[in-house]
Amino acid sequence: MGKTNDWLDFDQLVEDDLRDALKPPSMYKVILVNDDYTPMEFVIDVLQKFFSYDVERATQLMLAVHYQGKAICGVFTAEVAETKVEMVNQYARENEHPLLCTLEKA
């Protein structure tokens, strides 16, 4: 009898592992936050360079950041979102702009 129970326990463990492995990854919103100093052209550049938007869509998002205080640049897995936030913030600092990029769970 012990063997049967062991197999049932093993089957349950495998089933639990598969269920966990098949869960979609957590997603995160990458957000640009408005400030009074970063030029609009720089924000457009960031949106094109790091999020691959064309100039028209980048301009629309830049205006959303400007008038609404922030805008979602995209929704990504945790690792991708963290990397994009880090790269945008580093690029802004290298260019001496206070532009802030953050993330939050979607």
UniProtKB/Swiss-Prot annotation:
<dbReference type="InterPro" id="IPR014719">
    <property type="entry name" value="Ribosomal_bL12_C/ClpS-like"/>
</dbReference>
<dbReference type="GO" id="GO:0006508">
    <property type="term" value="P:proteolysis"/>
</dbReference>
<comment type="similarity">
    <text>Belongs to the ClpS family.</text>
</comment>
<protein>
    <recommendedName>
        <fullName>ATP-dependent Clp protease adapter protein ClpS</fullName>
    </recommendedName>
</protein>
<comment type="function">
    <text>Involved in the modulation of the specificity of the ClpAP-mediated ATP-dependent protein degradation.</text>
</comment>
<dbReference type="InterPro" id="IPR003769">
    <property type="entry name" value="ClpS_core"/>
</dbReference>
<dbReference type="GO" id="GO:0030163">
    <property type="term" value="P:protein catabolic process"/>
</dbReference>
<dbReference type="InterPro" id="IPR022935">
    <property type="entry name" value="ClpS"/>
</dbReference>
<dbReference type="Pfam" id="PF02617">
    <property type="entry name" value="ClpS"/>
</dbReference>
<comment type="subunit">
    <text>Binds to the N-terminal domain of the chaperone ClpA.</text>
</comment>
